[in-house]
């Protein structure tokens, strides 16, 4: 069963200023929590388009959202093709977009998907099960230098070199097949005192491999720009991030597009095309309330940023 606790539900959807006859895109359908609440505010003239590359998520969403009076369109695709897929449906502009960048709980909790360091399972981590690159391939075939780079860049792991060295030693003897084997190797690469602090010792490396396997940061950057381009004037975008790398991309994109470029002093009017594209609705990110954290610990690292197209 696809159970998924939605994070910052009302804040995310209410932040879009929903119009009942508007067109909205949920780029990360997942458990369909945000979509379900959004649909409750749409009339039969409204439209929701839900993107997901996970078959289980799409099947669950179809079931959960059946019977809504609004129009619903499900698209099985990575959101990096957001504009292209919408254009194929004859949609060239929208009134609101949601990104919820957390790995959905069912993906984390299904051991055979290989996302979790809590279960022993085959190394996989592909959001799209038909993709060629898996965690097993990264761990067993990528050169030492590339492993160090992704552990440091995507996992902000201090012991990147030591861990990559241990992986290199282990895979010379036999291929690393499971998450459990990888966890043990990671622990060997981290000094004992450091293993006792800062959460699970494999957390950062698993995050790094997942980001690399799914090309998450580049995909998000591309999709975010496409989403902003698709927005109608006064249309809004809500983005929930779960780690500093994604939040940095969102923050800098929003800041860049909501501020004026450096202009010569004393210009009487701002030249056309140079006006900011966005207005920030949230100066600082919205975080989960104490009340939400009581029943959903995964919301602890969530940050929500909202912007409006000018």
UniProtKB/Swiss-Prot annotation:
S-adenosyl-L-methionine binds at residues 32-34, 52, 79, 100, 107. Keywords: Cytoplasm, Methyltransferase, rRNA processing, S-adenosyl-L-methionine, Transferase. It catalyses: cytidine(1402) in 16S rRNA + S-adenosyl-L-methionine = N(4)-methylcytidine(1402) in 16S rRNA + S-adenosyl-L-homocysteine + H(+). GO terms for molecular function: rRNA (cytosine-N4-)-methyltransferase activity. Disulfide bonds: none annotated. Coiled coil: none annotated. GO terms for biological process: rRNA base methylation. HAMAP family: 16SrRNA_methyltr_H (MF_01007). Its EC number is 2.1.1.199. SUPFAM superfamilies: Putative methyltransferase TM0872, insert domain, S-adenosyl-L-methionine-dependent methyltransferases. The gene is rsmH. It comes from the Bacteria. This is Ribosomal RNA small subunit methyltransferase H. Its main location: cytoplasm.
């Amino acid at each position: 069963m696809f159970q998924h606790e939605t994070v910052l539900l009302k804040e995310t959807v209410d932040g879009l200023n929903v119009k009942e006859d508007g067109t909205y895109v949920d780029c990360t359908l997942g458990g369909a929590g945000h979509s379900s609440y959004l649909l409750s505010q749409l009339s039969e003239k409204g439209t929701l388009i839900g993107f997901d590359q996970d078959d289980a998520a799409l099947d669950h969403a179809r079931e959960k959202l059946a019977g809504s009076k609004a129009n619903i369109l499900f698209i099985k695709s990575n959101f990096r093709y957001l504009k292209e897929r919408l254009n194929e449906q004859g949609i060239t502009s929208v009134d609101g977009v949601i990104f919820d960048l957390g790995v959905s709980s069912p993906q984390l909790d299904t051991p055979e998907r290989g996302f979790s360091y809590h279960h022993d399972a085959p190394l996989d981590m592909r959001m799209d099960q038909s993709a060629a690159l898996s965690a097993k391939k990264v761990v067993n075939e990528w050169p030492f230098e590339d492993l160090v780079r992704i552990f440091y860049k995507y996992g902000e792991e201090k012991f990147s070199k030591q861990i990559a060295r241990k992986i290199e030693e282990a895979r010379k003897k036999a291929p690393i097949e499971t998450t459990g084997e990888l966890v043990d190797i990671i622990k060997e690469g981290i000094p004992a005192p450091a293993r006792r602090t800062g959460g699970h010792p494999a957390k950062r490396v698993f995050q790094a491999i997942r980001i690399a396997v799914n090309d998450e940061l580049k995909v998000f950057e591309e999709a975010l720009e496409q989403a902003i381009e698709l927005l109608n004037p006064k249309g809004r975008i809500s983005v929930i991030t779960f780690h500093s790398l994604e939040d940095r991309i969102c923050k800098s994109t929003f800041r860049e597009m909501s501020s004026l470029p450096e202009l010569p002093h004393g210009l009487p009017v701002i030249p056309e095309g140079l006006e900011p594209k966005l207005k920030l609705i949230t100066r600082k990110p919205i975080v989960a309330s104490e009340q939400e954290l009581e029943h959903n610990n995964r919301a602890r690292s969530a940050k929500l940023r909202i912007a409006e197209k000018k």
